[in-house]
Curated annotation (Swiss-Prot):
Belongs to the Speedy/Ringo family. It holds the Pfam family Spy1. The lineage of its organism: Eukaryota, Metazoa, Chordata, Craniata, Vertebrata. Residues 1-90 are annotated as: Disordered. Residues 76-90 have a biased composition (Acidic residues). Residues 18-40 have a biased composition (Polar residues). This is Speedy protein E16. It comes from the Eukaryota. One of its GO terms (molecular function) is protein kinase binding.
């Protein structure tokens, strides 16, 4: 009995050891067990078929948000766009600066990358149809735009005026001494024979004849001022047959503005142009008489005519592109076209 009891007790102890060894340890549950197949745990998980996840588990990746997704799409689109070609750097070339016998001096010059198509694009942006205004458009801008459209239509209806070309400059020989030559820059005059013919035709006008006969002191119409009239005819750009009496007095008035300091003598042009003389207008300083005269409809008409003359004078000045100054050489060249003309005898130096 004792031997059998001891055997059963030993067997019970062995079974207890086996059962205790098979119970899972809390630390061993958390640590992953090695697979009996010899593969790592990561490889076994990748081979498993994904099923429905647990209700509390988020299947989305942890660090991917909506902003990251948009950023990724934007980066993909930017990679697909072709790269813009940058403008080439300006090249430099060597040009001949001076050549003396067999010696040659070179100079490094940069080639400009500007092409004619760039000028065309720039000029197209300056066309009247281009809108240079900012995007914020107000009511005042709308009125201004409507006025601009109306002015464009009126300009299209009216024929465009052809302005006179700018005078060119040439080099002429002033002095020649042996192998040395002295050059002088000279401006080519734009005065043509047709301008002289238009001037001579206007001298036959009875009003202009009367005006020149009245100016005995040559304070308004000496030979230089009359030569400036011909120069202005060449710069205004009108055909010779279009010059009338008003153009003669406009040019003469503008010539007096440029050369004379006294303002009173040229005011007589108004009275000869509109059929009156200076002697018919009384010079009375009585304010009451002047007030009654201002209320006279004839006086108001005279003021409106003078205002119209000043407006035409400004238009005539603009038609010459503001080139109202005439050099002494050009005036002498105009007089040399027909030196025997009776107009060139109107010299102030002979009167004194």
């Amino acid at each position: 009995m004792d031997r059998t009891e001891t055997r059963f007790r030993k067997r019970g102890q062995i079974k207890g050891k086996i059962t205790t060894s098979r119970q899972p340890h809390p630390q061993n549950e958390q640590s992953p067990q090695r697979s009996t197949s010899g593969y790592s745990l990561q490889e076994v998980v990748d081979d498993e078929v994904l099923g429905s996840s647990a209700p509390g588990v988020d299947p989305s990746p942890p660090c991917r948000s909506l902003g990251w997704k948009r950023k990724k799409e934007w980066s993909d689109e930017s990679e697909e766009e072709p790269e813009k070609e940058l403008a080439p750097e300006p090249e430099e070339t060597w040009v001949v600066e001076m050549l003396c016998g067999l010696k040659m001096k070179l100079k490094q010059q940069r080639v400009s990358p500007i092409l004619p198509e760039h000028h065309k694009d720039f000029n197209s942006q300056l066309a009247p149809g281009v809108d240079p205004s900012p995007p914020h458009r107000s009511f005042c801008w709308k009125r201004k735009r409507e006025w601009w459209d109306e002015s464009e239509e009126s300009l299209e209806e009216e024929p465009r005026k052809v302005l006179a070309p700018e005078p060119e400059e040439i080099w002429v020989v002033e002095m020649l001494c042996g192998l040395k030559m002295k050059l002088k820059r000279r401006r080519v005059s734009l005065v043509l024979p047709e301008h002289h013919e238009a001037f001579n035709r206007l001298l036959e006008d009875p009003v202009i004849k009367r005006f020149l006969a009245w100016d005995k002191d040559l304070r308004v119409s000496d030979k230089y001022l009359l030569a400036m009239v011909i120069a202005y005819f060449s710069r205004a750009g009108l055909p010779s047959w279009q010059y009338q009496r008003i153009h003669f007095f406009l040019a003469l008035y503008l010539a007096n503005d440029m050369e004379e300091d006294d303002e009173d003598p040229k005011q007589n042009i108004f009275y000869f142009l509109y059929g009156k003389t200076r002697s018919r207008i009384p010079l009375v300083r009585n304010r009451r008489f002047q007030l009654c005269r201002c209320m006279n409809p004839r006086a108001r008409k005279n003021r409106s005519q003078i205002a119209l003359f000043q407006k035409l004078r400004f238009q005539f000045f603009c038609s010459m592109s503001g080139r109202a100054w005439v050099s002494r050489e050009e005036l002498e060249e105009i007089q040399a076209y027909d030196p025997e003309h009776w107009v060139w005898a109107r010299d102030r130096a002979r009167l004194s």
